[in-house]
Each structure stands twice: as C-alpha cells, then as structure tokens.
Amino acid sequence: MAPQKSLLQYICSFLLLVSSVSALKFDLIAGSKERCVRNFVGKDTLVVVTATVDGYKGDGMVVNLYIRDAVGNEYGRPRDVVGESRTVFTSHADAAFDVCFENVPSGSQRLNSPTRHIELDIDIGADAKDWSAIQATEKLKPVEAELRRVEEITSELVTEMEYLRAREQKLRDTNESTNNRVKWFGIATTWLLVGLWAWQIMYLRAYFRSKHLI
C-alpha cells in the first residue's frame, strides 16, 4: 500500500507542476500603462481569477480590472478593486484571455506612495474546482478525491494535446495548400512568359517583313 501511495504522490506532484496554474505579484503605479497577464484556455473550461489589491477606498487611487479574450468575449470588469476580488467564468472559445489592471489617480491630493500591490492567481480547469467541497458533498476519501483530481488533470492534458495536434494538422494543410498555389502560380507565370516571348517573336517577324527587311 505504501509504494502505491508514494507513486500516487509522485504522479500528483508532476501533474501539479504541469497543470494550468499561475501566480503573480507586482506593483502598479498610479497613472502608468495598464498591466496585463495572458493565459490560453480551451473552450468550455472553468477559470477562476483571484486578485488581491492592497490599499483602501478613497486613498487617491482606483484600481480597475477587466478580463477578455482574443476573440472579443468579456468575462468581467470589476471597478475600484480593494481587497480580494474573485471572478469565475467558463470560456467561450479556444483562445488566449487577458487579465488587465489599471491604476487611475483620483482626487487632487498628492500621493506619497502612488502604487498598489497586486497579487494575482489564475486557476484553470481542474485546479479551479473546490475539491474540498466536492470531497465533502460526494463523501469521498482523500485518496479518491485526489484520484478524481488527477484524472481530470490528465484528461485536460490529453484534450490539450489533441487540440495542438489538430492545430498542427490544420497549419500543415494550409502550408501544403499555399505551396500548391505557389507552384501553379509559378507554372502559369512561366507559360505566360513563354507565350509573351513567342508573341514578340511573331510581332517582330511580321514587322520586319512589312519593312522588307527579311
């Protein structure tokens, strides 16, 4: 039993490293350019974005947050974020999405330290689920809950690999189609030049004959 448990721990640790999870801490200066963090997500995937912003309302700074993907879908736009802000959504497309922050100065008072410290956590797929709640609701043992989690992470990895394989095939087909078009364009251009050369020869011969030069 102990070797199986140890093996399970190794597998879980590996999948935890390769799973789609990211954490980031940074300072955002008031009036500076917006700061964005980008992640890719598959369609119909659960995403939880947790942002923790220090400071307090009325301190002369307003931190706004918005989440949108590359195809134009918007998933949230919390305003004047202070403390913890959590946004939960399900993606509408296979696309990258941006989590962007802006720090807008408010009021006329002079700020001694015009920065807000931000902590950002983005959980995607199986990592976005509350496994403690699932374990309690379904009355699962800790090992069973961990196996469920590992199974879902593995399924997500397989789905992502299939998506990448399909995209690679699509790009390969596009490349082959482009090569064929270039080939036929080259052949058509060559025959056009040959025809133009033949026409010039015939035209010059007719011209010289009309002038009795040949």
Swiss-Prot record:
Lipid bilayer topology: Single-pass type I membrane protein
Residues spanning the membrane: 184-204
Keywords: Endoplasmic reticulum, ER-Golgi transport, Golgi apparatus, Membrane, Protein transport, Signal, Transmembrane, Transmembrane helix, Transport
Top-rank lineage group of the source organism: Eukaryota
Lumenal side: 24-183
InterPro entries: Emp24-like, GOLD_dom
One GO cellular component term noted in the UniProt record for this chain: endoplasmic reticulum membrane
GO terms for biological process, alphabetical: protein transport; vesicle-mediated transport
Ranges per topology, Cytoplasmic: 205-214
Domain GOLD: 34-124
Cell location: Endoplasmic reticulum membrane; Golgi apparatus membrane
Region forming the signal peptide: 1-23
Function: Constituent of COPII-coated endoplasmic reticulum-derived transport vesicles. Required for efficient transport of a subset of secretory proteins to the Golgi. Facilitates retrograde transport from the Golgi to the endoplasmic reticulum.
Family: Belongs to the EMP24/GP25L family.
Identification of the protein by name: Endoplasmic reticulum vesicle protein 25
UniProt source species: Gibberella zeae (strain ATCC MYA-4620 / CBS 123657 / FGSC 9075 / NRRL 31084 / PH-1) (Wheat head blight fungus)
Taxonomic lineage of the native organism: Eukaryota, Fungi, Dikarya, Ascomycota, Pezizomycotina
